[in-house]
Amino acid sequence: MPYRCSNCRRTHPAFHLSCPDCGAWNALLSIAEEFGAGDSLPVALPDVEGIPPPRTQTKIDPFDRLLGGGFVPGSSVLLIGTPGAGKSTLVLQLLRNIDAPSLYVTGEESVQQLKLRANRLEINSHKVFLLFETNVRRIIGHIERLHPAILVIDSIQAMYTDLSGAAAGSAPQIRKSVYALRRSAHRKGFILLVVGQVTKQRGAAGPKLLEHAVDVVLYLEEGEGSGNRRILYASKNRFGSTLNRCLLSMTESGLLFSPAAGARGAEIT
């Protein structure tokens, strides 16, 4: 029976504990196992049992409406915007309102810098854990121990995985990092909230697959004519509409939401 290495993809006629070509340990899988049916079985649509888990609401009505009723457990959400738009501020406010065990992983700011921002927002919850880490494998290890309801990655361009030898922020690293974290979210049922940088062309920095690999894409943009106005909208939403947007103002105490969400393309007053 032939075996293929999951690391270098070379094929070998016999099993080895380590790949004879690349040296990876426990990486050889039989061809039959690699392309087998797996653990799950096809189920007819009428026979699917159970109901979807309830959405996790932020208690911010305009934001929950924007998502279609709140976060869907096990989903992946990408939040992108220009530097200084308030992405980290928004994330901390969401974690405070949800009030569930959460892990905020930063690969750019120190945890001390995040703590200073949290102090300014008067956030001091024992349910919010901060971690400076860029290795996806180690992050998943912390997930197994903490069992968070929400995982924040800030930012995905700073992360890397041992499965790729490319530099952090490169297309291979972003692809492997996003898919590894998304698989973990599906398996454990936590909400994955990924923060990404935005380019001048209004695209997520890195390969376009960053947007294709998640369930929801949120843009946080600065409003025209004023330095404190922000616009938040979904360019992609598998669980709701993309026609609405949130209007916000940046203040000393954080981002304030306008009571009503506007329609995409409407004038801001």
Regions found by a protein language model. Give the residues of each.
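Cys/His-rich metal-chelating microdomains
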Residues: 11-15, 25-28
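Residues at the starts of beta-strands that form the adenosine-phosphate
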Residues: 101-102, 127, 191
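Short cysteine-rich clusters marking metal-coordination/redox-active sites
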Residues: 5-8, 19-22
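P-loop NTPase motor core
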Residues: 78, 89, 131-220, 225-228
